[in-house]
Amino acid sequence: ECLYAQAEKKLEEIAFDEYSEVLFISKSVGTIIASAYAEKYKIKCCQILYTPLEQTFMFEHDDAIAFIGTADPWSDVKKVIACSKNQAVPIYVYEDANHSLEKENILQNIDILKNVMEKTQKYLR
């Protein structure tokens, strides 16, 4: 609640209806905050959800993309994947990657980062 209140205070002066496009990029608990805010204020926006939590999907997503690792200790990965698919949100799953989308091997981390950024770029086009 405290984090949500902080975000709400920071965003209160923005007239979102004056913009033709709005993009929320969030990670972890921030995915819950961004999703809740967008729903509460009826902001038509695109969302990039990096390592979302299950609670993120308590809110509807009309235009979003998500990324998660199967070794994410902060998420119930199977539930997140199911919720994402239930809302028709494309979700990219990285085998054995943690909450930072990292593994033990740095070269694999670079490959994951490259893949995530390529998919993010494609989504933004």
Which residues are covered by each model-predicted region?
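Conserved alpha/beta-hydrolase fold motif
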Residues: 23-24, 47
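Conserved alpha/beta-hydrolase "acid-adjacent" motif
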Residues: 58, 73-79
